[in-house]
């Protein structure tokens, strides 16, 4: 699975080194939750993906890190949605492989209603996320990181 390696703080767009940054943040905030999500948008000739890591303080509020990457236009919706899942899962696996705790949730921009095209990817996505021991959330389950990723894509 692919992992994005150019990360920034959303608050000031400052580049960060992801693992040392997270280690420091977790040490200072031992009671917290971590959410990961990805969204994408198609432009006329390119597809932009934004993967976010939401660091949720136990007292409320959050701190957001993001990575944005652009690819040649991906016209196939299924392929684009699956790549969103891959970026989220790849990010979670990268964190765990580097000694960080397992994220609390991976949020996916997929709909449980079969009337929507994103539903075609939902079962496979949930299975993949659960197979690495992380709780998936999807539309109707309050996936915070997806709405943040949507804004980071633009």
Which residues make up each language-model segment?
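C-terminal edge-of-domain segments
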Residues: 48-50, 136-154
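Short glycine-rich phosphate-binding loop at a beta-alpha junction
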Residues: 102-110
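A short acidic (Asp/Glu
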Residues: 45-49, 114-121, 148-149
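Basic, amphipathic N-terminal segments that precede the first structured/catalytic domain
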Residues: 1-35
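Short, low-complexity, polybasic intrinsically disordered segments
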Residues: 111-142
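Acidic helix/loop or adjacent segment enriched in Glu/Asp that either coordinates divalent metal
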Residues: 71-102
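Catalytic phosphate/metal-binding cores of nucleic-acid and nucleotide-processing enzymes, i.e., regions
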Residues: 1-2, 73-78, 123-124, 131, ...
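Acidic, metal-ligating active-site segments
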Residues: 36-37, 41-65
